[in-house]
Structures are given as structure tokens and as C-alpha cells.
């Protein structure tokens, strides 16, 4: 598998892959592919970098990340559907760790709790649970609605 830094010319393809990622992980994001392309252009023109992984001339995965002073935040890692469970994700992470990212920074990634395969994958490559984000959706706290409370132990 080869890899290269993504450029702005890659944004249309990255947007298509990002759209697949959103659908596959069950995210609520409703952005269209053109909107995702514009967002990707903005990210790559700013503080994000992307790496594209190819095999036999085919794009098989990509990673999108932002390097900060003390950490590297991996926003997205996506392997195309027909190439999953073939070691590509693990190889992509290994390339990031061994050839792209400095070894002196904390590495973070966020995963949707409902995406069990992704949670298992990240744990299998060395990431450990750190935080859990909880939310209340607008419909859940509309006027006149009382939030459900879980009884606490005495």
C-alpha cells in the first residue's frame, strides 16, 4: 500500500469517501457531497492534513488529522467498503504512527458509541477509553418536557 499527502485536487474524492463514512458510522450529519467537498477544502486550506492510501492505483483509505501543540487529533479514518477487514485500516494507522506523526504527542480519536466495530478497531490498535460525551437532543428538552432522570443509588 502506498500513501501520499492529499491536495486540494483530491477534495472531490475525499468528499465522496467522507459521505460514505458518515452513512456507514450512523452519524446524523446531513451534508451533501458538494457541501462536504467545500468543508474538506476549508479544512485542508487550514489546519488539517489528509493522507490518501492507494493500492494498485485505487484509493482504499484516507485519514484526516490536525496536529496541535500537545496532541494529534485524528478526525477521520475511512477504508472503502469492499476493502474492509483486510488489514488496510491497521496498516494506515501504522503508517501514520511510524512515518507521519511525531512520537512526542498524545493521539486522540473520537468514535460514535453506537459504532461498535470502530470502537473495537481503535482499542485493538492501542487506543484506550478516555472520555464519553453525552448529549440531549433539542426534541428531548422541548418546552413542557421533563428530562427523564435515572435514579441514583442511596
Predicted regions and their residues:
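A short helix-loop-beta-strand connector motif used in the catalytic cores of GNAT acetyltransferases and
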Residues: 41-52
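Conserved beta-strand in the GNAT
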Residues: 52, 58-66, 73, 78
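A conserved beta-turn-beta hairpin within the catalytic core of GNAT-like acetyltransferases
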Residues: 67-75, 84, 103-105, 130
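Conserved acetyl-CoA-binding loop-helix of GNAT-fold acetyltransferases
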Residues: 79, 85-98, 120, 124
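Conserved active-site alpha-helix within GNAT-family acetyltransferase domains
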Residues: 90, 113-131, 136
Amino acid at each position: 500500500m502506498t500513501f501520499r499527502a492529499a491536495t486540494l485536487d483530491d477534495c472531490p474524492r475525499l468528499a465522496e469517501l467522507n459521505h460514505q463514512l458518515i452513512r456507514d458510522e450512523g452519524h446524523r450529519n446531513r451534508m451533501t457531497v458538494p457541501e462536504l467537498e467545500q468543508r474538506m477544502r476549508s479544512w485542508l486550506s487550514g489546519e488539517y492534513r489528509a493522507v490518501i492510501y492507494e493500492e494498485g492505483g485505487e484509493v482504499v483509505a484516507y485519514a484526516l488529522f490536525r496536529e496541535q501543540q500537545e496532541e494529534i487529533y485524528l478526525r477521520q479514518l475511512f477504508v472503502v467498503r469492499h476493502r474492509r477487514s483486510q488489514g488496510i485500516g491497521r496498516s494506515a494507522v501504522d503508517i501514520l504512527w511510524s512515518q507521519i506523526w511525531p512520537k512526542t504527542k498524545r493521539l486522540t480519536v473520537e468514535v460514535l458509541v453506537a459504532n461498535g466495530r470502530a470502537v473495537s478497531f481503535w482499542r485493538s490498535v492501542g487506543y484506550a477509553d478516555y472520555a464519553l460525551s453525552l448529549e440531549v437532543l433539542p426534541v428531548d428538552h422541548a418546552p413542557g418536557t421533563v428530562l427523564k432522570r435515572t435514579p441514583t443509588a442511596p
